[in-house]
């Protein structure tokens, strides 16, 4: 926490000097530049130029940070002033200023390039606990203020954009660090964090085993996996795409974990558990992965809440004074997983049959040229979204009890 307080004091002093608002304002005038998976691969190819990547990132990363900082500033005042949100904001400001220092430096200087990698590592480590810290800020705000439906909707809108922004900046930093760092710690068959020949079924099986181990530890039992794969693009061949295995693993682990929990709890009195089914299909345009369980499903009224950042079936975690903030219990598993899917123009949806089970479907682009970053931009449309006020519903809302027409007097 001492380090965090130092960062906050540093950011505050910069702000008082008038530097931070000017830099944030300057870079927020630019729109982020989304990259395709193919472009990210080109940045890391054998002929990759570190100077080109450096020149792009020293401009692009401040633009992405500044855009989301502008959105933080138009959140409700009581939320922005919570200690946790102030801490997150200070991290972003400090990181932006660290990156801006490279704007006047020459990409021809090898020491500058080396220092830039070190700075990216420092920024990435500084932002390690952004997700749970922002989540704690939301809890602090809700504990002290009444949140109306419109504000709640705006928070959902903001958090989707905030966390998508974080996924994107982390992706760019990881690519540069893994490719150009002196310590080659990445997988030699990968280009940065991207696998040009990602074995989708292998990732599915690995994510299942990780979730199964967790389920066995907690429940002392777990369902098996029934896997089906269909390659509609190249029949008979293994299913491979260009993708980030860690992103896919994150999504699948979350879905398998939920499916196993539902199955074990719903079928606790049965002699055996029905398997969790995974179906992987590669088409000409899309890769689709369906995870199906017989865990009893959820009612329709709850389905939409499952993607809300404020809904969780786990106990709310207790934050301590360390930076190792917990994430389980904040209700972020599914919404963050959906963002990972959407990041490269995919999606993640749930279809549940209450009393039977749930199908969770991940959609990904099959072509790397169509897998393009989905990025938030702060503009007039985004600003107007936060200014929306509550309006009367233009659909009739039924009362809890139907009107007893027999007691109504007929008009003469």
UniProtKB/Swiss-Prot annotation:
Its main location: mitochondrion. Disulfide bonds: none annotated. Residues 138-368 form the Histidine kinase domain. It catalyses: L-seryl-[pyruvate dehydrogenase E1 alpha subunit] + ATP = O-phospho-L-seryl-[pyruvate dehydrogenase E1 alpha subunit] + ADP + H(+). One of its GO terms (molecular function) is protein kinase activity. ATP binds at residues 254-261, 293, 312-313, 329-334. One of its GO terms (cellular component) is mitochondrion. PROSITE patterns: HIS_KIN. InterPro entries: AK/P_DHK_N_sf, BCDHK/PDK_N, BCKD/PDK, HATPase_C_sf, His_kinase_dom. Pfam families: BCDHK_Adom3 (PF10436), HATPase_c (PF02518). Gene3D superfamilies: Alpha-ketoacid/pyruvate dehydrogenase kinase, N-terminal domain, Histidine kinase-like ATPase, C-terminal domain. Its EC number is 2.7.11.2. The keyword Mitochondrion applies. Ubiquitous; highest levels of expression in heart and skeletal muscle. The keyword Transit peptide applies. It is an enzyme of class 2 (transferase). Induction: Up-regulated by exercise, starvation, glucocorticoids, thyroid hormone and epinephrine. Down-regulated by insulin. The record marks 157, 161, 395 as: Interaction with the other subunit in the homodimer. Keywords: ATP-binding, Kinase, Mitochondrion, Nucleotide-binding, Transferase, Transit peptide. Homodimer. Interacts with the pyruvate dehydrogenase complex subunit DLAT, and is part of the multimeric pyruvate dehydrogenase complex that contains multiple copies of pyruvate dehydrogenase (E1), dihydrolipoamide acetyltransferase (DLAT, E2) and lipoamide dehydrogenase (DLD, E3). This is [Pyruvate dehydrogenase (acetyl-transferring)] kinase isozyme 4, mitochondrial. It comes from Rattus norvegicus.
């Amino acid at each position: 926490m001492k380090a965090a307080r130092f960062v906050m004091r540093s950011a505050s002093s910069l702000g008082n000097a008038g530097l931070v608002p000017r830099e944030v304002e300057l870079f927020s005038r630019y729109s982020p530049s989304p990259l395709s998976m193919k472009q990210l691969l080109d940045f890391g190819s054998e002929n990759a130029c570190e100077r080109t990547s450096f020149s792009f990132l020293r401009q692009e990363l401040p633009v992405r940070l500044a855009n989301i900082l502008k959105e933080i500033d138009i959140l409700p005042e009581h939320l922005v002033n919570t200690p946790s949100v102030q801490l997150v904001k200070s991290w972003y400001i400090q990181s932006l200023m660290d990156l801006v220092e490279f704007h006047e430096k020459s990409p021809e200087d090898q020491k500058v390039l080396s220092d830039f990698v070190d700075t990216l590592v420092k920024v990435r480590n500084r932002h390690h606990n952004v997700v749970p810290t922002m989540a704690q800020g939301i809890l602090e705000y809700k504990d002290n203020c009444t949140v109306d439906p419109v504000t709640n909707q705006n928070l959902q809108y903001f958090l989707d954009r905030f966390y998508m922004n974080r996924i994107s900046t982390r992706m760019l930093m990881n690519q540069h660090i893994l490719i150009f760092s002196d310590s080659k710690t990445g997988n030699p068959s990968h280009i940065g964090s991207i696998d040009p020949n990602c074995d989708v079924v292998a990732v599915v099986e690995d994510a299942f085993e990780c979730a199964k181990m967790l389920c066995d530890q907690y429940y002392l039992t777990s369902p098996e996996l029934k896997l089906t794969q269909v390659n509609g693009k190249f029949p008979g061949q293994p299913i491979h795409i260009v993708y980030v295995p860690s992103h896919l693993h994150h999504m699948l682990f979350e879905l398998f974990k939920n499916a196993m929990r539902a199955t074990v709890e719903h079928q606790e009195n049965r002699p055996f558990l029905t398997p969790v089914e995974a179906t992987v299909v590669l088409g000409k345009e899309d890769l689709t992965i369906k995870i199906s369980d017989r865990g009893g499903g959820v009612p329709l009224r709850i389905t939409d809440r499952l993607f809300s950042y404020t809904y969780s079936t786990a106990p709310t975690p207790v934050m301590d004074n360390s930076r190792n903030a917990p994430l389980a219990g904040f209700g972020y598993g599914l919404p963050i997983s959906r963002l990972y899917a959407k990041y490269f123009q995919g999606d993640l949806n749930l279809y549940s049959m209450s009393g039977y089970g749930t199908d969770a479907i991940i959609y990904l682009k099959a072509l790397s040229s169509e897998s393009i970053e989905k990025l938030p931009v702060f503009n007039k449309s985004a600003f107007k979204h936060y200014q929306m006020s509550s309006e009367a519903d233009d659909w009739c809302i039924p009362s809890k009890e139907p009107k007893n027409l027999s007691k109504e007097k007929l008009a003469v």
